[in-house]
């Protein structure tokens, strides 16, 4: 099994060294494809990309995919700057980010690669918080509810220790929009999701939120909280409730790709094709949820049409040039 390294675990995020060599997984590197595609972005999406690269590297030892995990917002900044070919994101691109790309004449393609459920969890020893609605969550994360008793009069009068990702993360943006109605999050913030999990496990009054796979990996140390929808139905995050969107904090996960990279970088276009043909298997292996199969098929059809169109355009330009040279 190939081992993956995290380099530079600073506040700016770690970088995954991916697909750099064929490894003890039986990979013979039998592809003629050579080159590199660079990405950065969501730490939530990073485990999926890692799983994809375990498979990719088996047959593409000379086609490298490097992907950082600086956070969705930081990834989009690099994408806008033209420093990377693709950006991993745990939220849709914002209007202001779209505008900055437009101002730089950078066109992009959006690919939905999986689904996630932002999971709210409390300490394993918490025996009273089983479910919350969004208003209660908002009270906790706005700082208006200082103690559990402020949330529910039947709960203990003990100070809540709320922890949140910081604003560089798409998970933060999602929570801010879906729960806070864009009101400020007033809680301890951390760039490292594993540190958030650790904080909740160590503090009996702790509460935090993160991607579903972080809960799955730590379910023996955490207690998940059911979230009530607008009709008051409390639902826990599972693969089924996340995929059918019955879980109130379900969300899609994305890869955004620079169109120029899709046209000019064969490694980039082949990797995205590979991602879509995987049909969410890597996402499932990483602890997330595959999108409906038709989602991958329609996106793959669109990608192939885009590549074919540009190939025909390039062929025409080549033929025109040859004709000019003969004159």
UniProtKB/Swiss-Prot annotation:
Say where the lipid (N-palmitoyl cysteine) is covalently attached: 21
Q: How does it assemble?
A: The complex is composed of two ATP-binding proteins (PstB), two transmembrane proteins (PstC and PstA) and a solute-binding protein (PstS).
What subcellular locations does the record give? Cell membrane
Q: Taking the first listed entry, what is the main subcellular location of this protein, grouped into a coarse class?
A: membrane
Q: Which organism is it from?
A: Staphylococcus aureus (strain NCTC 8325 / PS 47)
* Leader sequence residues: 1-20
What UniProt keywords apply to this chain's record, in alphabetical order?
Cell membrane, Lipoprotein, Membrane, Palmitate, Phosphate transport, Signal, Transport
Q: State which gene encodes it.
A: pstS
GO cellular component terms given for this protein: plasma membrane
Q: Which Pfam families match?
A: PBP_like_2 (PF12849)
Give the function comment from the record.
Part of the ABC transporter complex PstSACB involved in phosphate import.
Family, as annotated:
Belongs to the PstS family.
In what way does this protein cross or attach to the membrane?
Lipid-anchor
Q: Tell me a GO biological process for this protein.
A: phosphate ion transport
Please give the sites of covalent lipid attachment annotated as S-diacylglycerol cysteine.
21
GO terms (molecular function) for this protein are: phosphate ion binding
According to the record, the residues making up region (Disordered) are 307-327
The record lists the lineage as: Bacteria, Bacillati, Bacillota, Bacilli, Bacillales
* PROSITE patterns hit by this protein: PROKAR_LIPOPROTEIN (PS51257)
Q: Know the name of this protein? A: Phosphate-binding protein PstS
């Amino acid at each position: 099994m190939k081992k993956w390294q995290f380099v530079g675990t600073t506040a700016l995020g770690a970088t995954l060294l991916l697909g750099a060599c064929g490894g003890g997984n039986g990979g013979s590197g039998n592809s003629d494809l050579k080159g590199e595609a660079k990405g950065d972005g969501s730490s939530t999406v990073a485990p999926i990309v890692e799983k994809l690269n375990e498979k990719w590297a088996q047959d593409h030892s000379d086609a490298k995919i490097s992907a950082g995990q600086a956070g969705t917002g930081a990834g989009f900044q690099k994408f806008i700057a033209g420093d990377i070919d693709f950006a991993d994101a745990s939220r849709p691109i914002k209007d202001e980010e779209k505008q900055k790309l437009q101002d730089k004449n950078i066109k992009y393609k959006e690919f939905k690669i999986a689904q996630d459920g932002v999971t709210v969890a409390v300490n394993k020893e918490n025996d009273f918080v089983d479910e919350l609605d969004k208003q209660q969550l908002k009270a906790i994360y706005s700082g208006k509810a200082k103690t559990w008793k402020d949330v529910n009069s039947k709960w203990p009068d003990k100070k809540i220790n709320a922890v949140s990702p910081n604003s560089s993360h798409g998970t933060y943006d999602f929570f801010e929009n879906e729960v806070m109605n864009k009101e400020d999050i007033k809680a301890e913030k951390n760039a490292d999701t594993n540190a958030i999990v650790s904080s909740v496990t160590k503090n009996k009054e702790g509460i935090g939120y993160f991607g579903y796979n972080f809960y799955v990996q730590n379910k023996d140390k955490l207690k998940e909280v059911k979230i009530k929808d607008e009709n008051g139905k409390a639902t826990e995050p599972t693969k089924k409730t996340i995929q059918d969107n019955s879980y109130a904090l379900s969300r899609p996960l994305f890869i955004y790709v620079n169109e120029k990279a899709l046209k000019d970088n064969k490694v980039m276009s082949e990797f995205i094709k590979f991602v879509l043909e995987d049909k969410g298997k890597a996402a499932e292996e990483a602890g997330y949820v595959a999108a409906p199969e038709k989602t991958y098929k329609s996106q793959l059809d669109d990608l192939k049409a885009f590549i074919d169109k540009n190939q025909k355009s390039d062929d025409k330009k080549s033929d025109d040039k040859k004709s000019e040279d003969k004159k």
